[in-house]
């Protein structure tokens, strides 16, 4: 590696050589620690940078501290050539992804021993390139700037890593390109500061576009729509990567009496944790940006026009066919997240947002149906943030009393979609919120027979014991409500228990003959359901015998109580469970033993 003095001389004197020779010299000396300020001085020669600038993007971007040099390249290089190199570099970074950080760490250790310049991390490279795009895109004066803007945004989206810093750089980019500049906000502990050369740099240094043309009148609308679409895509990716937990927070807000005293809440965590505060701040900035871009409409026509149409997972994928604003769609997941944020921030922060004109039936049901599709588990796994957003929308609509505008209410289908989120969502807080909301929706169904059908479907056809247990709990709540309110419905007579008894208390006679390991697995899979079933049996036989069908006690004892008592007792003696597991097993045995069956 050459000495700094040697590199300084080479960079200064080499500019007199032909372009190819000088680029070769720069490639050799660019990694010398301390050389970049000298190179930036040389690049102030506009004629030189116009000739070689685009070739320097690849050379400089891996080097930490290259930002000033590349800003100069963006201001003085040929904008149409440099922007192509920037897009190529972003595409290359999109293929590297997160794994490159490990490579960079190894390179840093090796380079330290060779006294070379420190490599730049992938996120920092992306931020630098995004800053260059903001300058370049505004320098290009062409009849159809959307033909540069569209591919540039696709390149950024492909390389985008949803960190707060990269997202802030994206926000700065869109603000620069939209021409809308907000006054600086007061600094907060959750603020994120990244380089923004287009806003903070010297615009007077920008060289003119050597191929300038007058812009077509239609381009303003096209460019705005591209920025809207791009920003909704970024919003979707950000909330999918970072748990916003809107639905659990709304649940705590709407039902404060359900909060267990002394237990930490999600709301409190988002008020106090620095990382979570920053997370909220970034999403708030994205939403504010969309408002600046003209999206401030929560009408039925707007939301249904985006979210209730056939799925369009990549709205920026077909820019080669772009002819009009109508050819550019918004991200469906991003739009759902936007609506969820409007509802959440209105209720949680008293923010001034558009009021939703949607209803659960049919609007939100259609949104859920389109999102979950035929592969709900995969869809929720790929888009956990969107699933949380959809759940938050449902909670907000229900809280506002916006249930339906039609007599066609598919409570069972809607309830089914909620239970899918309750089962498949990776975050337990969101799963719990979905479960709670599913119970609320069930009890909201005005048709008692429809409510019973939903419960029967869950008990008979659902393969998830946790949901089977929920169905039993909801059934008990229906029975208690009918009794307390003096209502004469299907939950006030033995007919419902007669109809559901074999799903409530399935045949478990095989359990008595299972070996220890087999029953241990069986118990582990079904423990939640068995405990709830035993509790419900106690509720019936020791309190509401008027609902117990004739002859049910003997049948229940034979097929459910006796075999499970035998198997559970053997498991307890085998010491195959930990302390908490043993306590749950003992509770189950005691509950079965205390049933007043005879």
Could you say what each language-model-derived stretch is?
Residues 15-16, 35, 125-133, 173, ...:
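HEAT-repeat alpha-solenoid elements in large eukaryotic scaffold proteins
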Residues 161, 377-386, 418-432, 441-447, ...:
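Short coil/turn segments at helix-helix junctions and helix-capping linkers
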Residues 437, 563-598:
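Eukaryote-biased recognition of C-terminal alpha-helical segments
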């Amino acid at each position: 590696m050459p000495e700094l003095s040697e590199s300084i001389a080479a960079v200064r004197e080499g500019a007199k050589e032909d372009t190819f020779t000088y680029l070769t010299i720069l490639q050799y000396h660019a990694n010398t620690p301390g050389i970049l300020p000298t190179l930036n001085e040389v690049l102030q020669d506009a004629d030189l940078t116009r000739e070689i600038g685009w070739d320097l993007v690849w050379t400089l971007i891996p080097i930490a501290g290259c930002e000033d040099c590349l800003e100069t390249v963006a201001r003085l290089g040929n904008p149409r050539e440099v922007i192509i190199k920037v897009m190529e570099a972003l595409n290359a970074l999109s293929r590297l992804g997160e794994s490159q950080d490990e490579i960079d760490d190894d390179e840093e250790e090796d380079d330290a021993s060779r006294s070379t310049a420190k490599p730049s991390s992938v996120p920092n490279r992306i931020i630098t390139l995004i800053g260059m795009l903001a300058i370049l895109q505004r320098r290009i004066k062409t009849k159809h700037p959307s033909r540069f803007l569209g591919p540039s945004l696709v390149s950024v989206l492909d390389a985008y890593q949803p960190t707060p810093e990269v997202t802030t750089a994206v926000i700065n980019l869109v603000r620069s390109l939209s021409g809308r500049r907000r006054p600086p906000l007061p600094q907060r502990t959750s603020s994120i500061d990244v380089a923004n050369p287009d806003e903070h740099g010297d615009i007077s240094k920008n060289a003119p576009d050597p191929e300038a043309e007058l812009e077509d009148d239609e381009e303003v609308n096209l460019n705005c729509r591209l920025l809207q679409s791009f920003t909704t895509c970024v919003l979707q990716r950000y909330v999918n990567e970072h748990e916003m937990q809107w639905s659990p927070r709304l649940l705590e807000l709407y039902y404060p009496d359900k909060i267990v005293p002394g237990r930490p809440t999600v709301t409190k965590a988002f008020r106090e944790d620095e990382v979570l505060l920053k997370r909220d701040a970034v999403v708030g900035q994205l939403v504010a940006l969309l408002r600046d871009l003209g999206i401030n409409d929560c009408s039925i026509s707007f939301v249904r026009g985006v979210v209730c149409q056939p799925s369009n997972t990549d709205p920026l994928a077909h820019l080669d066919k772009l002819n009009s604003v109508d050819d550019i769609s918004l991200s469906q997941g991003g739009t759902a997240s936007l609506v969820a944020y409007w509802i959440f921030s209105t209720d949680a922060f008293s923010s001034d947002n558009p009021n939703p004109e949607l209803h659960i039936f049919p609007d939100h049901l259609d949104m859920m149906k389109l999102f979950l599709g035929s592969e709900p588990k995969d869809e929720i796994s790929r888009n956990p943030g969107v699933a949380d957003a959809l759940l938050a929308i449902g909670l907000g609509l229900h809280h506002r009393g916006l249930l339906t505008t039609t007599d066609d209410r598919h409570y069972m289908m809607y309830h089914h979609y909620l239970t899918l989120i309750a089962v498949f969502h990776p975050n337990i807080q969101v799963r719990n919120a979905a479960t709670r909301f599913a119970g609320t929706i069930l009890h909201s169904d005005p048709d008692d027979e429809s409510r019973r059908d939903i419960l029967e479907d869950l008990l008979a056809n659902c393969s998830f014991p946790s949901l089977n247990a929920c169905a039993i709990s909801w059934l008990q709540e229906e029975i208690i409500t009918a009794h307390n309110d003096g209502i004469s419905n299907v939950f006030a007579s033995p007919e419902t228990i007669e109809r559901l008894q074999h799903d409530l208390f399935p045949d478990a006679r095989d359990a008595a003959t299972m070996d220890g390991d087999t029953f241990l697995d069986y118990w582990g899979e079904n423990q939640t359901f068995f405990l709830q079933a035993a509790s419900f049996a106690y509720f019936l036989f020791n309190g509401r015998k008027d609902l117990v069908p004739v002859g049910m006690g003997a049948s229940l004892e034979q097929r459910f109580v006796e075999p499970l008592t035998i198997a559970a007792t053997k498991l307890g003696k085998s010491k195959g469970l930990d302390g908490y597991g043993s306590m749950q097993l003992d509770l189950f045995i005691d509950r079965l033993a205390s049933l007043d069956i005879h």
